[in-house]
């Protein structure tokens, strides 16, 4: 019996999401979650909400326009949270972040269900300039969440240290 690379990668995504949601739960348990979500570790640095929303919006972009050429959900949020965006001071609530993470993951899983391991070498039109295959992109998405969850986690710890 062989297990597909797509299934293995989805399992890694699940573990990463558990860690991301644990960080979000820790924030939600604090006395003023919105204040925590808007806290920045330094001038011009990304706040916690941006780190978490960026995870979801990136997955939404890959699930739609980057893999299959469709329009992403959250068209109003994409410019605010896609890679290269500048974090603004309009801080989303915990429930909004949780919904974006859940829905974008569902969209990504739905898109991935249309692929087989034999499709992993395909380079979608939207990723040609980066020469990024579906297989490489799904591995990068696993790294991407862990990277930004780690940034959110250390930012939360810095917030706690600064506000004891």
Spans of model-derived segments:
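Hydrophobic alpha-helical core bundles mediating ligand binding, dimerization, or RNAP-core interactions
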Residues: 13, 17-20, 24, 101, ...
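Acidic/histidine-rich alpha-helical segments that form the ligand environment
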Residues: 84-125, 136-144
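Surface-exposed helix-capping loop/turn segments at secondary-structure junctions
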Residues: 26-35, 110-122, 157-164
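Short acidic/polar alpha-helix capping motifs at helix-coil junctions
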Residues: 1-2, 72-73, 85-89
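Active-site rim elements
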Residues: 3-11, 91-98
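Short, contiguous alpha-helical
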Residues: 10-14, 18-21, 33-82, 125-164
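Low-complexity, compositionally biased segments
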Residues: 28, 62, 91-93, 160
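Residues within well-ordered alpha-helical secondary structure of globular protein domains
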Residues: 26, 54-57, 103
